[in-house]
Amino acid sequence: KNSYSNYMLLPQKMEDALFAGDPPYDGLDAIFISHYHGDHFTPEDVLRFMNARPDVDMYVPSQAAIALRAIASAADQDIFDRVKSVDLEYKDAPISLVVENLEIEALRIPHSGWPTGRLDVANIVWRVTLDEATTVIHLGDADANDIHFSTDPEFWNSKQPDMAFPPYWFYSSQVGLNILSRRIGAQQSVGIHVPAAMSNDPSLRPAELRDVDLFTVPGETRAISGH
C-alpha cells in the first residue's frame, strides 16, 4: 500500500471484493507476486488475504515469503501450506513446476535500475500456462535491457505467450520493443505499472506511448484472443 507518490492504490471497494471473494474474484485460484516492494507486496495485507481466502494459493519470491513469515503468528501457520516460494539469483536457470492445471515457470530478471540500483531485489518473471492452452507472462518491474533476455533463447523460444504484461517502460525504447517482439513474442501485450499521472486518453500521453495498450484504470481487463 505504498504508492511512492507515483502509482495508484487499490480502491477500497475493489479491495473489499477481493478479500471477500465476490465477483469477479470468486474464481481466483492463485496469485503471483513479482517482488517485495511496497507498491507490489504488503506483508500485513497479504497475510490477511491468505487467511480470508483459504481457496487461493500464492507464488512468491523467497524475499516475500520471509517477510510474510516474519509477521505471522502461530495461528497463521496453516497459510504457508499454500505459499510457494522460489529462490533465484540473477542468471540462474529458470525453474518450472506443474500444479494441477497450471504449468508455472519462473525466471529472475533484474529490477529496473540495473546495473546500479535495486540489485538486491529479486524480481521474478512468471510465465504461466493454464490447461496446456493459454500462456500469460508477467514481467513485474523488469529492466528493459536485452542482456538479461539474450542468454537463454531456449527458454524464450519454447513458448509463445498469448498475453504479456510488461512494465510500461518497455514501450519507451527500441530495446524494450525488441525484447517484446523478438524474445518474448507474445500475441498480445498490455503495459502495466503505469503512473497515476498517465492519461487515459492516448493522445495526451508521451509520443512513444500513444499507440500501445496500457492499463490505466484499476480493475480493467482485456480479453485474450482465441480463448
Name each model-derived stretch.
Residues K1, G27-D39, Y59-S62, I137-A142, ...:
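Active-site neighborhood of phospho(di)ester-bond hydrolases with catalytic His/Asp-centered motifs
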Residues K1-F32, Y36, E44-R48, D143-K159:
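Pre-active-site segment of Zn-dependent metallo-hydrolases
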Residues F19-E89:
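Active-site HxH/HxHxD metal-binding segment of metal-dependent hydrolases
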Residues Y25-G27, D92, V121-N123:
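Extracytoplasmic
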Residues H37-F41, A65-L68, D92-I95, S112-W114, ...:
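Active-site environment of divalent metal-dependent phosphoester hydrolases
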Residues E44, P110-R183:
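Active-site-proximal loop/helix segments of hydrolase catalytic cores
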Residues A72-L102, L177-H227:
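Binuclear metal-ion centers of metallo-dependent hydrolases, dominated by the metallo-beta-lactamase
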Residues I95-E105, T129-V136:
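Beta-strand-turn-beta hairpins that frame and shape the catalytic cleft
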